[in-house]
């Protein structure tokens, strides 16, 4: 009975619950996606996949810091053709588990984005455009910090595929509404916010930055308040579904994002703190809250704006 309380519909797609895996370190292989699905996620988001194989940055690429993690992976992936074989291995099993697949993609320009999207379309339920990675020069936030480039990429992908397209936004901008307006004008079906916040850690003994890339993206508890404010602002300005991400560790965190305006949430760093079954734990905590407050999931989305 409780699980039925969490069923949600986004862009015509039914999800058994609104607690998803975020794109990142956990989505590299089909087996990793399956492990997360078994942990209770309503959807799994792949690692960001490009047209060609990419080794990413040299190690060290991740370090734990106060309040979360700094990572500069550099978008490592096997390329879309090889990665689709990973999805193929687990797609039927995920479908039997009623778990949807969100395909995160990146590219250097609109043509590359569109080509990857077309290849991935029949394997996933939603395309998520990574125009927000803060540590891959020429990719990600290089596009997502420019409204014109963001518009061009989103317009090209919307033209290339028929399934819903969401744009994942970077917080590393002066005016995120300007960027969001550009991608909404280009026709995206929804928004994902936020990606990681640019940061750095220095080894005072070695007297140099810890990450090989020098700087990276901060994820985890430290960025939750930033993410919630961005979701709040997006909800105030746009009439498209929003997926909230950044620092979600508990049902209470997820509910905060939903009350700010998110229709669903994604969890990344939280897997390290609470295990693969964090998705079930968060779902159970949301259900308990809804029962205690005599509310429905639909009612809490945007509730803090009333």
Swiss-Prot record:
The active site is at 133 (nucleophile). Its cofactor is FMN. One of its GO terms (molecular function) is dihydroorotate dehydrogenase (NAD+) activity. Substrate binds at residues 47, 71-75, 130, 195-196. Keywords: Cytoplasm, Flavoprotein, FMN, NAD, Oxidoreductase, Pyrimidine biosynthesis. Binds 1 FMN per subunit. Its EC number is 1.3.1.14. GO terms for cellular component: cytoplasm. NCBIfam families: PRK07259.1, pyrD_sub1_fam. This is Dihydroorotate dehydrogenase B (NAD(+)), catalytic subunit. It comes from Methanocaldococcus jannaschii (strain ATCC 43067 / DSM 2661 / JAL-1 / JCM 10045 / NBRC 100440).
């Amino acid at each position: 009975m409780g699980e039925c309380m969490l069923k949600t519909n986004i862009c015509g797609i039914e999800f058994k619950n609104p607690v998803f895996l975020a794109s990142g370190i956990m989505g590299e292989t089909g087996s990793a996606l399956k492990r997360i699905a078994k942990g209770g996620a309503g959807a799994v988001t792949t690692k960001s996949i490009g047209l060609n194989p990419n080794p990413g940055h040299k190690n060290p690429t991740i370090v734990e810091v106060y309040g979360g993690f700094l990572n500069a992976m550099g978008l490592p992936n096997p390329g879309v053709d090889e990665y689709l074989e990973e999805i193929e291995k687990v797609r039927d099993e995920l479908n039997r588990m009623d778990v949807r697949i969100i395909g995160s993609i990146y590219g250097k320009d609109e043509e590359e984005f569109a080509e990857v999207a077309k290849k991935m379309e029949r394997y996933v339920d939603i395309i998520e455009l990574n125009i927000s990675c803060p540590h891959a020069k020429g990719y990600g936030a290089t596009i997502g910090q420019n409204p014109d480039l963001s518009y061009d990429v989103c317009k090209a992908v919307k033209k290339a595929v028929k399934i819903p397209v969401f744009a994942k936004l970077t917080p590393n901008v002066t005016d995120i509404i300007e960027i969001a307006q550009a991608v909404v004008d280009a026709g995206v079906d929804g928004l994902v916010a936020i990606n990681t916040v640019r940061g750095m850690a220095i080894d005072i003994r070695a007297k140099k930055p810890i990450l090989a890339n020098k700087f990276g993206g901060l994820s985890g508890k430290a960025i939750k308040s930033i993410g919630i404010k961005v979701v709040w602002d997006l909800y105030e300005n746009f009439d498209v579904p929003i997926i909230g991400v950044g620092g979600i560790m508990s049902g209470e965190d997820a509910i905060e994002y939903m009350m700010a305006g998110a229709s669903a949430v994604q969890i990344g760093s939280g897997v390290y703190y609470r295990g693969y079954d964090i998705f079930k734990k968060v779902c159970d905590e949301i259900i308990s809250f809804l029962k205690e407050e005599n509310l429905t999931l639909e009612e809490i989305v945007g509730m803090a704006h009333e």
